[in-house]
């Protein structure tokens, strides 16, 4: 059971985010909507910081971010320690993001995906279990690189 999921978007992902909030509610998932709340132009880093920061600090187990393409949100989210944000464009990528990479943040493009496809992707991502095994060895290497960068070793 997921303890908490944070979701956020900029203006380019607002419509999709609002629909995904309904999907998450229908699944009875504890969810915090981190905004934006209207279609005024806003800066995507502000919302990526809220969601990825919560995941990084352990306040949220998972996060979902939506901007126009998903690219900007992915870049920001992956700056946070312990965040494995995956930009996905189809159901297979959403599945592999969790199954092989244990992605704890799913990033979507509100201007490049239909709400129907995004809904399917979110459901697949949430329903997919992390496989572990050889994939955990790779995630351990990522964690080692992350620690070395943060310490100034790399």
Model-inferred region functions:
Residues 27, 80-81, 101:
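Short, structured coil segments at secondary-structure junctions
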Residues 30-41:
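A short beta-strand-loop structural module common to alpha/beta enzyme folds
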Residues 17, 44, 48, 73, ...:
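A general structural signal for well-ordered alpha-helical segments in protein cores
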Residues 6-26:
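Glycine-rich phosphate/diphosphate-binding loop of Rossmann-like nucleotide-binding domains
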């Amino acid at each position: 059971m997921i303890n908490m999921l944070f979701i956020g978007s900029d203006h380019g992902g607002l419509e999709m985010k609002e629909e995904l909030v309904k999907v998450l509610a229908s699944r009875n998932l504890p969810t915090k909507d981190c905004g934006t709340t209207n279609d005024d132009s806003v800066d995507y880093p502000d919302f990526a910081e809220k969601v990825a920061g919560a995941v990084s600090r352990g306040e949220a187990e998972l996060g979902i971010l939506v901007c126009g393409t998903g690219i900007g949100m992915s870049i920001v989210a992956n700056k946070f320690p312990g965040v494995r944000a995956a930009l996905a464009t189809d159901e297979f990528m959403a599945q592999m993001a969790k199954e092989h990479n244990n992605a704890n943040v799913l990033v979507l493009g509100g201007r490049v995906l239909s709400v129907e496809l995004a809904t399917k992707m979110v459901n697949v991502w949430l329903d997919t279990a992390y496989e572990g095994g050889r994939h955990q060895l790779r995630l351990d290497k990522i964690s080692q690189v992350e620690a070395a960068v943060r310490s100034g070793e790399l």
